[in-house]
């Protein structure tokens, strides 16, 4: 390229059209801290808009990051009135789905019901599927127009703190997977619907009507996920071989889904060159990190490559996230920002 992209996420934070931001990467690389930092900066830079941060990771670390308990319903972050968080529980969603299924037909020998259970159970990443449906349900309940009640919320952007890489990619496959599944259900409705109604399955039509509505929502979201004006993916990694390898694999797969990805956040960097008295281990590790950073700079020259420092403590609480997240917009400089990092470590 003839020019180097700025090493920040400024373009994402300032982009007016973004509706969805996915944050993902290998386990243990700082996805939750990064997604929380992005959400905090969005909220700070756009105080008149509402934002929602959702964890689809079964480990659920948002409560730890903000030092505040979150659950399956969106809850405001203390200290940031325009940011809400929620943690989706796939197991609870599965239980709800099983209970709802009973209302349509209590006959365990119903062949259509048995077939549907088999098909549902064969979805790759059923827990992610249920998480996805939970997100759709919640967003739809929150979406408002001019005639809705004023106490309802319309979110400008929704940020996903995703599960480790493999789960993330299955989650992103779900729109197309669910579309195929629902198409099969619709085909069954055409073939067996009249017969099931004659046999007393009057509720079958209601079920298929709901499935049609779900398919419409899934199709709409799928179109948004592949629109770079509406959706982007932020990769998170550390400067090590396995993490770099996983990041490249993930980027290639995201591109196969036609998803926009042009930003990489590299966490846990030592910057030992600027340390007055670095230990031998720090120097050795920094040399290793620098080797892979140089490879990333060459491999991802057309990406925003954001370098975040390693701290001696965890980043927890809104105030600490506000300080740390600044480095997503202004590149970290050890000589300039050293005191800020020290203050974060002392808390």
From Swiss-Prot:
Active site: 57
UniProt-recorded name of the protein: ATPase GET3
Keyword Cell membrane: no
Pfam families cross-referenced by the UniProt entry: ArsA_ATPase
A Gene Ontology cellular-component term: GET complex
EC number annotated for this UniProt entry: 3.6.-.-
Record's keyword terms, sorted: ATP-binding, Cytoplasm, Endoplasmic reticulum, Golgi apparatus, Hydrolase, Metal-binding, Nucleotide-binding, Transport, Zinc
Assembly information from the UniProt record: Homodimer. Component of the Golgi to ER traffic (GET) complex, which is composed of GET1, GET2 and GET3. Within the complex, GET1 and GET2 form a heterotetramer which is stabilized by phosphatidylinositol binding and which binds to the GET3 homodimer. Interacts with the chloride channel protein GEF1.
Single Gene Ontology MF annotation: ATP binding
Family, per entry: Belongs to the arsA ATPase family.
InterPro entries: Anion-transp_ATPase-like_dom, ATPase_ArsA/GET3, ATPase_ArsA/GET3_euk, P-loop_NTPase
GO biological process per UniProt: tail-anchored membrane protein insertion into ER membrane
Location relative to the cell: Cytoplasm; Endoplasmic reticulum; Golgi apparatus
Binding-site list for Zn(2+): 279, 282
Function as written in the Swiss-Prot or TrEMBL entry: ATPase required for the post-translational delivery of tail-anchored (TA) proteins to the endoplasmic reticulum. Recognizes and selectively binds the transmembrane domain of TA proteins in the cytosol. This complex then targets to the endoplasmic reticulum by membrane-bound receptors GET1 and GET2, where the tail-anchored protein is released for insertion. This process is regulated by ATP binding and hydrolysis. ATP binding drives the homodimer towards the closed dimer state, facilitating recognition of newly synthesized TA membrane proteins. ATP hydrolysis is required for insertion.
Positions that bind ATP: 26-33, 240, 267
């Amino acid at each position: 390229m003839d020019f180097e992209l700025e090493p920040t996420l400024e373009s994402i934070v300032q982009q007016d059209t973004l509706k969805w931001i996915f944050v993902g990467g290998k386990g243990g690389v700082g996805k939750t801290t990064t997604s929380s930092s992005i959400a905090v900066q969005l909220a700070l830079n756009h105080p008149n808009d509402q934002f929602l941060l959702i964890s689809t990771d079964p480990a659920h670390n948002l409560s730890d990051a903000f030092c505040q308990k979150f659950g399956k319903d969106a809850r405001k972050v203390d200290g940031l009135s325009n940011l809400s968080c929620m943690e989706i529980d796939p197991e609870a969603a599965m239980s709800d789905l099983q209970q709802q299924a009973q209302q349509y037909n209590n006959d365990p020998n119903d062949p259509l019901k048995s077939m549907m259970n088999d098909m549902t159970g064969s979805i790759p990443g059923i827990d992610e599927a249920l998480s996805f449906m939970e997100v759709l349900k919640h967003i739809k309940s929150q979406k408002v127009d001019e005639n809705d009640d004023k106490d309802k919320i319309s979110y400008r952007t929704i940020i996903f703190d995703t599960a480790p890489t493999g789960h993330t990619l299955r989650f992103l496959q779900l729109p197309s997977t669910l579309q195929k599944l629902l198409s099969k259900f619709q085909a069954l409705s055409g073939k067996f619907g009249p017969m099931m109604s004659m046999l007393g399955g009057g509720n079958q039509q209601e079920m298929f009507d709901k499935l049609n509505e779900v398919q419409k929502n899934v199709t709409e979201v799928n179109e948004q996920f592949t629109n770079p004006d509406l959706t982007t993916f932020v990769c998170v990694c550390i400067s090590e071989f396995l993490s770099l390898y996983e990041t490249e694999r993930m980027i290639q797969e995201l591109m196969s889904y036609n998803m926009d990805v042009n930003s990489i956040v590299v966490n846990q960097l030592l910057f030992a060159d600027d340390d007055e008295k670095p230990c031998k281990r720090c120097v050795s590790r920094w040399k290793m990190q620098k080797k892979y950073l140089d490879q990333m700079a060459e491999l991802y020259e057309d990406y925003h490559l954001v370098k975040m420092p390693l701290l001696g403590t965890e980043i927890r609480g809104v105030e600490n996230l506000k300080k740390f997240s600044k480095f997503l917009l202004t590149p970290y400089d050890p000589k300039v920002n050293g005191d800020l990092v020290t203050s974060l470590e002392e808390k």
